[in-house]
From Swiss-Prot:
Signal peptide: none annotated. InterPro entries: ESRP, Nucleotide-bd_a/b_plait_sf, RBD_domain_sf, RBM12_RRM1, RBM12_RRM2, RBM12_RRM3, RBM12_RRM4, RBM12_RRM5. SUPFAM superfamilies: RNA-binding domain, RBD. Residues 98-116, 717-734 have a biased composition (Low complexity). GO terms for cellular component: nucleus. It holds the Pfam family RRM_1. It comes from Pongo abelii (Sumatran orangutan). The modification Phosphoserine is found at S352, S375, S420, S422, S424, S525. Residues 783-811 have a biased composition (Gly residues). SMART domains: RRM. This is RNA-binding protein 12. Residues 824-838 have a biased composition (Pro residues).
Length: 932
């Protein structure tokens, strides 16, 4: 639907193309610009769509030809009414003052006009007069104060540079009121004209030469008087205007003083439009003299260049010139990356500063399919990028040549260097933060990466770890803002075979980070000394190890080292777990040198390792040794039991279930003596065959909280998050038993009627196991256990636990509907001191799930992203917000194709809310994303 916008403040020199250039990038149909003019300089613009009109309204306050314009919503009715009103005003003005255009053919003036002029002998030839007749008639009527002849012939033959206002009704209306005292103005020296008997012989007078003054014309007898005009007080006589140069076409009578509002002489032979001669009042007279030589201001070479950022990689020089259509582009230089491909940035040189000024107005406009940023640039940037400079000698007004400006030495003035070297804390500084540097990176590599940019001496800082290798972080400070912006443009360019992330950072933030890195090194050295002095101290309790699960079974030590690239770790500190046959278990253990490095490894959680998402959990050294002795079994989606080292249930030793634990005292010999199945051991990895997963709750403390409820499917809208797979470890119940599902199954679901293990139909359990059947008293355990279970699950009379094992371990509670405990610990209402009424909920930090009003991580949904978007691009989009490392999850459909959606977890609800408010409808690539 077409939308009409009303524009006010349009200068008189602007045309439809200027308006279209102002709204470049928006769709305006042909014939959609209507200039009305008037006192407010109005125009109406018709946009094709509502979106174009909305974007157009955002440009209110911009400038067209140096004049600020205002945009208002309008309608077609208002536009038509204003156009009709303007047309009527124009027609009325034409009726009052017919134009005396010599080149226009048409009928002679109306009888009313000839009656007012009352010149029957000259009116017939007035429609198409020759230049000589016009001159003669003008001179004759001027000397006899013939007002109408002056207002038509002189206006009709006015030079074109006088503008439209010179012949407007308002301009002509002043002539009758000021022409009567013209006899007081001394004309140029003209000899007296001989008396003529009457006017009829005038056509027979031979033409008089054009050049003024006219020396031979005789005086004309008086003409019949014209109706009286209101008298005007006599004006001060003007000085003789003999010094005024002749006009072309021939001059008419000298302008009276009341016409320009001041008694100062006004030169009409200049190229300025008289509508822009300033306020028309005697208080502010305009002194204009063509003979005065005004020296033009020197042109700063830096005013000719602009920098363009964010262009499409496929953009060519012609696309850049089309983007700046209507402006005089001198040259275009597209910047390349290290392999010669366009990096989306470029420099453009214009012929004049005016073109540069207009080009800067096109910031954030559309080039092909991307919004580009246009910012000022310098000649030094142009030269550094490989652009050529042609020095042209400037011609001054007197014809003297001026040498080309010396720009390069100026940029390296001593004062500038002195300012750049200042280490004042009040200085903002132009610093960048580098991430992803190669481990062997040195200062020379950084200088080569930022080649041709002015770097402050001794400002390159590369962070090194305790092993003496680079950690991949670095800082650089530049001398000026132009080089600083150019450095930011090299974000994600390659240094060697690694792309470098270049992020802006304040000088204060840079110094704080450097100080933090140095303190970390000092603390590490102190920790090393303490470890040497007290090797058995608190080392075992420090979480300096990582347990990596859900990795391919064919993983090698080198694959793990490459996965941990950027974190200092010794090759001997990596252990890939294997079974008795030497086959990989899909797990690895890594021992780091300090807790900081171990915490860094958590950032790699759910990152791809040889095509699979690796789960990284930080554990203590004691836990690592325990895992080495009894590695937990792993299925398709990772561990089925929590890793050791998590909070144990009070009163439950860490034996039967690592991290949650069944008391080994309650299960002597790791078996159930009264089951009737000798040798059917329940291993420490879990209760295989009894429907209990061996590691269903990773780390039991919310280590998997970010994606327990949010997987590849969107939250609350997809299938339940299951833990399919087999139960590793030794068991006597035959083949592995898949655990029940989490979302809709009986895994802590609090739904009665779960089938017993004996007759559940699970593989390897074809017979009704004594003690696990449906009888009420088949299993008699110690006094701490309640009555015999009727169903080994959530049914009545479920397997009881020791006293105090009522409502689950403290601190593991969560909102209803979250991951519950194993089936044996479900909410069975059995008699005795059995399990309590509530399920054991294993969830993330408080407030992470649907419970409201609690601080904690919050997940938002991102939609309408490009299908080719990567996790790094999503993290760059949320740069500056506290995103939980490794929490970005892309969504795929059933065919494995990306859907353009993702889930991102933030460290707090406030951060997530701020991200939604600030970044909603912002573009990633060429598409605007939606945040929920």
């Amino acid at each position: 639907m077409a939308v009409v916008i009303r524009l006010q403040g349009l200068p008189i020199v602007a045309g439809t193309m200027d308006i279209r250039h102002f709204f470049s990038g928006l769709t305006i149909p042909d014939g959609g610009v209507h200039i009305v003019g008037g006192e407010l300089g109005e125009a109406f613009i018709v946009f094709a769509t509502d979106e174009d009109a909305r974007l157009g309204m955002m440009r209110t306050g911009g400038t067209i030809k140096g004049s600020k314009v205002t945009l208002l919503l309008s309608s077609k009715t208002e536009m038509q009414n204003m156009i009709e009103l303007s047309r009527r005003r124009f027609e009325t003005a034409n009726l009052d003052i017919p134009p005396a255009n010599a080149s226009r053919s048409g009928p002679p003036p109306s009888s009313g006009m000839s009656g007012r002029v009352n010149l029957p002998t000259t009116v017939s030839n007035f429609n198409n007069p020759s230049p000589s007749v016009v001159t003669a008639t003008t001179s004759v009527h001027e000397s006899n104060k013939n007002i109408q002849t002056f207002s038509t012939a002189s206006v009709g033959t006015a030079p074109p540079n006088m503008g439209a206002s010179f012949g407007s009704p308002a301009f002509s209306s002043t002539v009758p009121s000021t022409a009567s005292p013209m006899n007081t103005v001394p004309p140029p020296p003209i000899p007296p004209i001989p008396a003529m008997p009457s006017l009829p012989p005038m056509p027979s007078i031979p033409p008089i030469p054009v050049p003024p003054p006219v020396p031979t014309l005789p005086p004309v007898p008086p003409v019949p008087p014209i109706p009286p005009v209101p008298s005007v007080p006599p004006m001060t006589p003007l000085p003789p205007m003999s010094g005024m140069p002749p006009l072309n076409p021939p001059p008419v009578a000298p302008l009276p003083a009341g016409m320009n509002g001041s008694g100062a002489p006004m030169n009409l032979n200049n190229n300025l439009n008289p509508m822009f001669l300033g306020p028309l009042n005697p208080v502010n007279p305009i002194q204009m003299n063509s003979q005065s030589s005004v020296k033009p201001l020197p042109i700063n070479p830096d005013d000719l260049y602009v920098s363009v950022h964010g262009m499409p990689f496929s953009a060519m020089e012609n696309d850049v010139r089309d983007f700046f259509h209507g402006l005089r582009v001198d040259a275009v230089h597209l910047l390349k990356d290290h392999v010669g491909r366009n990096n989306g940035n470029g420099l453009v040189k214009f012929l004049s500063p005016q073109d540069t000024f207009e080009a800067l107005k096109r910031n954030r406009m559309l080039m092909i399919q991307r919004y580009v940023e246009v910012s000022p640039a310098t000649e030094r940037q142009w030269v550094a990028a490989g652009g050529h400079i042609t020095f042209k000698q400037n011609m001054g007004p007197s014809g003297q040549t001026h040498p080309p400006p010396q720009t390069l030495p100026r940029s390296k003035s001593p004062s500038g260097q002195k300012r750049s070297r200042s280490r004042s804390p009040h200085e903002a500084g132009f610093c960048v933060y580098l991430k992803g540097l190669p481990f062997e990176a040195e200062n020379k590599h950084v200088i080569d990466f930022f080649k041709k940019l002015d770097i402050v001496e001794d400002s390159i800082y590369i962070a090194y770890g305790p092993n003496g290798k680079a950690t991949g972080e670095g800082f650089v400070e530049f001398r000026n803002e132009a080089d600083y912006k150019a450095a930011l443009c090299r974000h994600k360019q390659y240094m060697g075979n690694r792309f470098i992330q270049v992020h802006p950072i304040t000088k204060k933030g840079m110094l704080e980070k450097i100080d933090m890195i140095r303190k970390r090194l000092q603390n590490f050295s102190y920790d090393q000394r303490e470890m040497i002095l007290n090797p058995e101290g608190d080392v075992n309790s420090a979480k300096v190890c990582a347990h990596i699960t859900n990795i391919p079974f064919s993983i090698t030590k080198m694959d793990v080292l490459q996965f941990l690239e950027g974190i200092p770790v010794d090759e001997n500190a990596v252990h890939v777990l294997v079974d008795n046959n030497g086959q990989g278990l899909g797990q690895a253990l890594v021992q780091f040198k300090n807790e900081d490095d171990a915490r860094k490894s958590e950032r790699l959680h759910r990152k791809k390792l040889n095509g699979r998402e690796a789960f990284v959990h930080v554990v203590t050294l004691e836990d690592m040794r325990e895992i080495e002795k009894n590695p937990p079994a792993q299925g398709k989606k990772g561990l089925k039991m929590p890793v050791p080292g998590n909070p144990a249930v009070p009163g439950m030793p860490n034996a039967g279930l690592p991290g949650v634990g069944l008391p080994s005292a309650g299960l002597p010999g790791a078996g159930l003596p009264s089951t009737g199945l000798p040798g059917s051991a329940i291993t420490s990895a879990g209760l295989p065959g009894a429907g209990m997963p061996s590691a269903g709750i990773p780390s039991a403390g919310g280590e998997e909280h970010a994606f327990l409820t949010v997987g590849s499917k969107e939250a609350n809208n997809g299938p339940p998050f299951n833990f399919p797979g087999n139960f590793g470890g030794s068991n006597a119940f035959g083949p592995p038993i898949p655990p029940p599902g989490l979302g809709g199954g009986a895994f802590g679901d609090a739904r009665p009627g779960m089938p017993s293990v004996g007759n559940s139909g699970l593989p390897g359990l074809g017979l009704d196991v004594p003690g696990f059947g449906g009888g009420p008293n088949n299993l008699s355990g110690p006094s701490g256990f309640g009555g015999g279970p009727q169903n080994f699950g959530n049914g009545p009379g479920s397997l009881g636990g020791p006293p105090g094992f009522g409502s689950g371990p403290p601190g593991l509670g969560s909102a209803p509907g979250h991951l519950g405990g194993p089936p044996a610990f479900g909410p069975g209402p059995g008699p005795g001191p059995g399990p309590g009424p509530g399920p054991i909920h294993i969830g993330g930090p408080p407030g992470f799930a649907s419970s409201s009003g609690k601080p904690g991580p919050t997940v938002i949904k991102v939609q309408n992203m490009p299908f080719t978007v990567s996790i790094d691009e999503i993290l760059d989009f949320f740069y500056g917000y506290q995103v939980i490392p490794g929490s970005v999850c892309l969504k795929y459909n059933e065919k494995g194709m990306p859907t353009g959606e993702a889930m991102v977890a933030f460290e707090s609800r406030d951060e997530a809310t701020a991200a939604v408010i600030d970044l909603n409808d912002r573009p990633i690539g060429s598409r605007k994303v939606n945040l929920y």
